[in-house]
Structures are given as C-alpha cells and as structure tokens.
Amino acid sequence: MIYGVGTDIIEIARVQGVMERTRGRFAEKVLGADELAKYHARKARSERRGLAFLATRFAAKEAFSKAIGLGMRWPMTWRAMELMNLPSGEPTPICHGELAQWIAERGITVRVSVSDERDYAVAFAIAERGGHAAVPENPA
C-alpha cells in the first residue's frame, strides 16, 4: 500500500553557488559519511560529476522526506538517510539512527529514483507500507 510519494528538482548551478559560498561545507552538512566519500571520489575525477552527485543526493533526501510525510524535521535529518547504490546500480536509501527506528516501527519501505542532466537533478520517492521489509540501516 502506498504510504506517500515525494519529488524534488534542483538546478545544479544553485548547488554550485551554495558550495562556493560555504567553501564546500554544504556537502559535509548534507551528505552522510559514505555519500561524502563517494562525492569526493567523483569530484576528483570530474568537478561536474561531483556537483551532479551532490545535487541528486540533495534532491533524493528532499523527495524521501516528503514521501515519508515528515519533511526535513526530526527524525529526518540530512545525514540520517544516505542514498547508496547496490552493485546493480539501483539507488537504495539507507537510514541511520532514530530515522531507521522510525521507518522500521511503521513498516515502511522507500524506493528512490534519481536522474541528472546538464542543468538539473531530479529525484522521485515512493514509500510503501505492508508486505515488504523496512529500509535497512546498513547495506547487506
């Protein structure tokens, strides 16, 4: 059963502007530890791909927060949910701490899709309840 849906779109140039104004601290505020490591690896290869990665993760967190009905309020925080990829490439939300507990208590599963083009990054999330395992705290 559908619990909620969420979507977000962001202009990549806006993310670039925030990164310049914050001297890169924006990435540290928004990304979890595993996401941050992946961001730095992508940025080292291509500044543009690093920004696109950051923008898709920002959009994914916004879409995820809307799908679960909390918005960006406790226990949903920027770093409480990381969007990582399975070996197949499928993006998978990984929840930590109190958010993982909140999701598990409600039996919610969330699927997220992200995409980016030259100017924009977009994310869509669908939260379901019943008949599925909850979003894991740690990838298997």
From Swiss-Prot:
Keywords: Cytoplasm, Fatty acid biosynthesis, Fatty acid metabolism, Lipid biosynthesis, Lipid metabolism, Magnesium, Metal-binding, Transferase. GO terms for cellular component: cytoplasm. Gene3D superfamilies: 4'-phosphopantetheinyl transferase domain. It catalyses: apo-[ACP] + CoA = holo-[ACP] + adenosine 3',5'-bisphosphate + H(+). Transmembrane segments: none annotated. Its EC number is 2.7.8.7. One of its GO terms (biological process) is fatty acid biosynthetic process. Pfam families: ACPS. SUPFAM superfamilies: 4'-phosphopantetheinyl transferase. Mg(2+) binds at residues 8, 62. InterPro entries: 4-PPantetheinyl_Trfase_dom, 4-PPantetheinyl_Trfase_dom_sf, ACPS, Ppantetheine-prot_Trfase_dom. GO terms for molecular function: holo-[acyl-carrier-protein] synthase activity; magnesium ion binding. Transfers the 4'-phosphopantetheine moiety from coenzyme A to a Ser of acyl-carrier-protein. Belongs to the P-Pant transferase superfamily. AcpS family. This is Holo-[acyl-carrier-protein] synthase. It comes from Cupriavidus pinatubonensis (strain JMP 134 / LMG 1197) (Cupriavidus necator (strain JMP 134)).
